[in-house]
Amino acid sequence: LNTTTLNLNTGAPNLTFRGYKRKNGDVGVRNEIWIIPTVGCVNGIINQLAEGLRRETGGKGVDAIMAYPHNYGCSQLGDDHENTKKILRDMVLHPNAGAVLVVGLGCENNQPDVFREFLGDYDQERVKFMVTQKVGDEYEEGMELLRELYAKAIQDQREDIPLSELRVGLKCGGSDGFSGITANPLLGMFSDFLVAQGGTSVLTEVPEMFGAETILMNRCRTKELFEDTVKLINDFKEYFLSHGEPVGENPSPGNKAGGISTLEDKALGCTQKCGTSYVEGVLPYGERLKVKGLNLLSAPGNDLVAATALASCGCHMVLFTTGRGTPFGTYVPTMKISTNSTLAKNKPGWIDFNAGVIVENEPMEKTCERFIEYIIKVASGEFVNNEKKGYKEIATVSYTHLRAHETV
């Protein structure tokens, strides 16, 4: 990247990263093998299978071998069940996975055969199913399937991919008084740059937008998108109010200790993460991206739930700003950007990029140029801290106001 000629307002032509081109034309930034359960009853099995393949292969030739346990897939009904199915489907189809083994029990609500149909078109050489009640030794059967998948995945090679194919999620957590001054505006500048390149950014954690939602509404490309954004906000507000919960009591103890006093403070910082671009799409929870540019996604503020939702809509990585610090990660690279240099110094095993230099007289534009360079490195294979440490988890919503059958 030649930063001397970089124009952050219009983008720079022909920027690329080294990614994986999938059979269906989609692009990934990782080539991993995932083991995904249809139901929580088989969590122990999938963990053993992942460990078995790592031990047998040493993980050579792929970026990671991961099991993703969860607690759902049974004892769920209606929208709650549909939301779980959608997130699991999105994972199976995610381009950061070079191969996926779906493991079911057999008697669960999330029936493996029904879930297979729910996937739609998928690469049957890269996605395999095992129903544990129908096989004798589930470990040996699972290992045989994983060996087949591994043999396919290790053939994949990185190639030059236009930056216009990159999709990033925008998230904050453990925010402080510097969030709206350093890291969040930095993400906004990067988001505008990526959109100018033809790429995609996605903003979520809807309850964090309360108090600054009109900023987003005024930037909707069409009347329909404006109406979708109004519904996105109001659905969450109505959910809180219907349960007698005060909408304004969002800031956490950590937020307040860090200098954020009101929900409006927090919301103004939250919305800065998406820059000044027009809103081009509004997505229901569990739905996948359909248009490039800036999108809004229906998901709560909970860090792991929201980050999982961002990955599931198709984001290749999550850019996560924090003033207090957090180690977590979801199933795509979860990059931590500190709002202050003290955090970056004290937690180098958590923080990947320090935006605190912005209040130490480094121009925002220079910081953003370094940030772009770093993101291209990560998209091309450099691990962030949550990947190095194996902090990778998933979480889904367990309430039903995020209606699976409606578009917002």
Where are these regions (language model features)?
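Active-site rim loops that border cofactor/substrate pockets in soluble metabolic enzymes
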Residues: E238, E245-I260, E264-V305
